[in-house]
């Protein structure tokens, strides 16, 4: 088969769809007073990271329970949660903007029913 045709087109496995129970109404956070020094670029957080943070830190679920709700493994929740916590800490410590954006593979819970 010619190159670029057939089986070998994709790289790795397809990303599993993540079930999102809450789409944030406020998606852009910024400091009340912009820094006087050179501003740093904004931080981008995906819906997946936001959902993991919401379920574990806000609702108090375990990572296993959050993974079941999102339709992913506990390890995936751990990765998203670690990334989200780091981004929130960067936003607070460095006074940077935080923008929450869809990652492309999230589905609102109940949309497939």
Curated annotation (Swiss-Prot):
Family from the record: Belongs to the UPF0251 family.
Superkingdom assignment: Archaea
Short name of one Pfam family: DUF134
SS bond list: none
Protein name: UPF0251 protein TK0562
Lineage start: Archaea, Methanobacteriati, Methanobacteriota, Thermococci, Thermococcales
């Amino acid at each position: 088969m010619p190159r670029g045709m057939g089986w070998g087109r994709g790289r790795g496995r397809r990303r599993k769809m993540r079930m999102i129970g809450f789409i944030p109404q406020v998606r852009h956070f910024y400091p009340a007073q912009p820094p006087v020094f050179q501003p740093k670029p904004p931080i981008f957080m995906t819906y997946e990271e936001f959902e993991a943070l919401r379920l574990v830190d806000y609702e108090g679920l375990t990572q296993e329970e959050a993974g079941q709700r999102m339709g992913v493994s506990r390890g995936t929740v751990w990765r998203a949660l670690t990334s989200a916590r780091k981004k929130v800490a960067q936003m607070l410590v460095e006074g940077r903007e935080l923008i929450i954006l869809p990652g492309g593979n999230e589905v609102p819970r109940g949309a497939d029913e």
